[in-house]
Regions:
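A helix-boundary/hinge signal
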Residues: 1-176
Length: 176
């Protein structure tokens, strides 16, 4: 795997550490960084902070790679913002393309799920979204147990984070 851009490779390796924070939130590394740098938020919405360590600053710099290479898998919908997050199974953007409607202060996907039936609120979905988006949403299967939402890697076909797939994403983000 001959690397032509060391900056993109470095971002990919750092993104692997960021992916570890996301995929193993109970690991010692994830808990230490969370306690110090994002105690009230999650890694994807974290800020660099006032005087960050070199390690944190470096990992935080890889957030662009992680954000571009992930999308949400719907569980209970509590962590997924309807308009801002990537959560639809549409590879073009993974985001809702329907015009944004006033849906409260912070509209979450959970507001589209009926807690009694553990299924989509079909009429609400059809009334809010364009037919294309509504169809995509209603095709997303929901687990009856409504587990936590989870991030999945979309950087390759297998859905597994690799430095190679992160490198290709980093190449598109790095200024030459």
């Amino acid at each position: 795997m001959g690397f032509r851009n060391i900056q993109a490779f470095n971002l990919a390796v750092l993104a692997k550490q960021g992916w570890r924070i996301l995929s193993s939130p109970n690991s010692l590394m994830a808990r230490v960084f969370k306690a110090k740098y994002f105690p009230y938020d999650d890694f994807l919405n974290s800020k660099k902070g006032g005087s960050p360590s070199y390690v944190w600053r470096s990992i935080h710099n890889s957030l662009g790679v992680i954000k571009k290479g992930t999308r949400w898998r719907v569980g209970n919908g509590r962590r997924i913002h309807i308009w801002d997050d990537k959560w639809l199974p549409t590879p073009s953007s993974y985001k809702v393309v329907s015009p944004q409607l006033d849906f409260g202060d912070y509209p979450m996907v959970s507001s589209l799920i009926d807690n009694d039936t553990m299924w989509w609120k079909v009429e609400v979905v059809r009334s809010i979204f364009l037919p294309f988006d509504a169809s995509s949403i209603l095709k997303i299967p929901l687990n009856y147990n409504l587990p936590e939402d989870s991030l999945i890697w979309i950087g390759n076909k297998k859905g597994v984070f690799t430095i190679k797939s992160a490198y290709h994403i980093a190449l598109s983000l790095v200024d030459f």
